[in-house]
Design a protein with these regions (language model features):
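N-terminal beta1-alpha1 cap of cysteine-dependent amidohydrolase-like domains
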Residues: 1-233
């Protein structure tokens, strides 16, 4: 996209000013699977790398997003035609949760090639805390239902930070948090009990303007009257 050109130029200048031994270009790219032919296609990545080179950037590492494992044949093809080492072709396949990604990247050797490229002394990584977090995330002891009251719930990323915070808090307490999104515009005295009677807690998300304000006030009233724990974010 034309919007990314200033950022790519900034990266090029950083590489030029700091030198290749003090910088590293990691190119995240998609390896699509074509159902019709039953194969993963590397051509889009080859074109992407070529376009980067035309802008003065050479990828040191390819991180290849795919929905399945990349064979050594595909990795060799990418290494040959994209002019990177075989070990620098890193697969990033779909995982159960985004928090699996650091472990997968370590298994693929991304940490080692990064340290090697930047000439940083290699030490044994300690990911015990991260693995413990993953274990608690995937093995909750019980579940709770939290209502998220907002006016932008149709946009999945509008309350991303709140949703991620609930994941972190739930994991720390070994609880799976089921989030029920409720549009504040559609809350009234007739349906509020039906929408919220199964909630263990309520979060009223921030929003600008008068639209949906009455619904938020009703949600707070419901929480106070029924002694449901609630948090209002302004």
């Amino acid at each position: 996209d034309i919007e990314s050109l200033p950022f790519l130029e900034a990266v090029r200048q950083v590489v030029y000013e700091e030198g290749p031994e003090n910088s590293m270009v990691i190119h995240l790219t998609l390896i699509p699977f074509l159902t019709a032919t039953g194969e993963l296609k590397t051509k889009p990545t080859q074109h992407s790398v070529k376009t980067l080179m035309e802008l003065g950037l050479k990828a040191d590492v390819l991180v290849c997003r795919a929905d399945r494992e990349l064979s050594d044949e595909i990795k060799n093809k990418l290494a040959l035609f994209c002019n990177v080492k075989f070990d620098c072709v890193i697969q990033s396949i779909d995982v159960e949760t985004i928090y699996d990604v650091p472990i997968k990247m370590m298994e693929e050797g991304l940490d080692k090639v990064t340290l090697e490229k930047l000439k940083i002394k290699e030490t044994e990584p300690n990911l015990d805390k991260w693995k413990n977090f993953l274990h608690k995330l995937k093995n909750p002891t019980h579940q709770i239902n939290i209502g998220l009251i907002g006016k932008y719930i149709e946009l999945s990323d509008s309350y991303k930070s709140i949703l991620e915070s609930l994941i972190h808090a739930g994991t720390e307490n070994e609880v799976k948090v089921n989030v029920k999104s409720i549009h504040s515009e559609y809350i009234d005295r007739e349906n509020i009990g039906k929408d919220m009677n199964d909630l263990d807690g309520i979060i009223v998300a921030p929003g600008f303007g008068q639209r949906g304000l009455d619904g938020k006030i009703l949600a707070v009233e419901y929480a106070r009257v029924n002694k449901v724990p609630f948090l209002v974010i302004c």
